[in-house]
Structure formats: C-alpha cells, structure tokens
C-alpha cells in the first residue's frame, strides 16, 4: 500500500517519524547518527540507518509469525518503514542473559557471566532524568502503565528473548542483553515498537566473543560499521 509522507512529527537520536495519509500509520526513517551515554557522546556509523531498518523489519516479521504483536506494517525503502502509530509506554525494558555493561559495573561482577535465567529491568524513559531504573511498583505509582499492561509487557519481553536467542544462536551470535520498547495502538493494544538492532542489543560472536554492536562506538573500539554489517550478513544468510 502507498503511504503519502506528510509532516515530521518527531526526531529522536536515531530516527525521524513522519505522519502519513493514514491517521493510524506513521513512517519511521532511520538515521546514521550514533549516540551513547544518554546523548553525551555523539558520532556517525555509516550505513547504520539502512542496516537497522532492514534488521528490525526482518526480526519483527519473524516475531509476528511466532505470535508477538509488533508495530510493523511495511518496509518502504532501505531506510524507511511504515509502522502502526502508537503511544509509547515510557518504560524501557532490559532483558539480560549474560553480565555486561551497566549490570556488571553496578554489581561489581565481571562481564561474560552466563545467567541461569534471564533478568528483567525497567527504566523510566526520560532523557532529562537519565532514564533511571525503576520497578513495577514505581511504574504503577506514576501511572505509566496498569498492572495488566506491565504483566503483558513482561510476558512479551521474555517471549522475544527466547525467540531472539534462538535466531541469533543459529548464526553464531550470543544475545547478551537488549532493550525493548512497547506502545499502545489506538484501540489500546500493547505491541512491540521501536527497533531491534545492534543499537539496542549487545551481540557477541559465539566463538571469539567479539563485540558486534554499539559498544564498539560506545567504547571507542573502532570497526562499528563492519560489526553492524557482519550481523546483517549473517542474519540475511539465515533466510
């Protein structure tokens, strides 16, 4: 279906959002801009926008096939996708399978510890406050979501983790941790939104433990473009 792109509604760190001729559909346009540490570090990863767009769409289509509702509608070009217009629930959901990043620092443990079961964390999606960690009781107190919505978000998040770990294991990648965002459609349905990419996931090569994600930019390791391309190459080869 053809969607006429209208005015820009929003511009974030990694994407722009445009209205369309359909009031229930918006167009997401992925940028090459890269940020870390809540926007304190800024740069560019050449080609990132196109890779993240295609990878997100590929994975969301697979998740839909397995029963996880998403905002995905139609891939329009290498950088643009039509998605359902949603009201984002201001909770970032972090699932962790292996210790790394802020988890390792917060609890004083080494990176690379494989957990017996995945952990789940929430953070309040608020740049001005630095996206502070919160629990479900905080979310209820602040009326960010209802108990039923929180329960459903947790159910979907763990389901996404199980499925993504399987997808990544087939291509020799460990899914270390990742961030999800959910939104509500016009009729109140909770769906997976935002993106699934090396911007939002920690991905390590299963054999070498080489980092294949935004940590390469975040930690000034170099090779971010090549890492993103490698994940995409493996994922597309698994079709």
Predicted regions and their residues:
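Conserved metal-phosphate-binding beta-hairpin within the catalytic cores
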Residues: 95, 175-194
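Phosphate-binding core of ATP-grasp and ATP-grasp-like enzymes
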Residues: 113, 118-130, 161-172, 197-202
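Short histidine-centered catalytic/ligand-binding loop motif
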Residues: 40-50, 133-156
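A long amphipathic alpha-helix within ATP-dependent nucleotide-binding catalytic cores
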Residues: 144-176
């Amino acid at each position: 279906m053809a969607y006429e792109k209208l005015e820009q509604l929003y511009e974030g760190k990694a994407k722009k959002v445009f209205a369309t001729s359909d009031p229930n559909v918006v167009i997401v346009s992925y940028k090459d801009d890269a940020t870390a540490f809540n926007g304190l570090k800024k740069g560019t990863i050449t080609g990132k926008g196109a890779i993240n767009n295609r990878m997100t769409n590929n994975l969301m289509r697979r998740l839909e096939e397995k029963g996880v509702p998403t905002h995905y509608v139609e891939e329009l070009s290498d950088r643009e996708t039509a998605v359902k217009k949603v009201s984002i629930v201001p909770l970032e959901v972090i699932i962790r399978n292996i210790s790394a990043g802020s988890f390792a620092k917060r609890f004083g443990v080494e990176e690379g510890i494989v957990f017996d079961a995945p952990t789940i964390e929430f953070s309040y999606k608020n740049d001005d406050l630095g996206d502070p960690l919160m629990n479900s009781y905080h979310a209820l107190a602040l009326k960010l979501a209802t108990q039923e919505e929180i329960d459903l978000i947790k159910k979907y998040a763990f389901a996404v983790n199980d499925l993504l770990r399987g997808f990544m294991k087939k291509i020799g990648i460990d899914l270390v941790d990742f961030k999800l965002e959910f939104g509500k459609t016009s009729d109140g349905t909770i769906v997976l939104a935002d993106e699934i990419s090396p911007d939002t996931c920690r991905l390590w090569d299963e054999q070498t433990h080489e980092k294949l994600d935004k940590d390469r930019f975040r930690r000034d390791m170099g090779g971010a473009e090549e890492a993103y391309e490698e994940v995409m190459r493996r994922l597309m080869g698994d079709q």
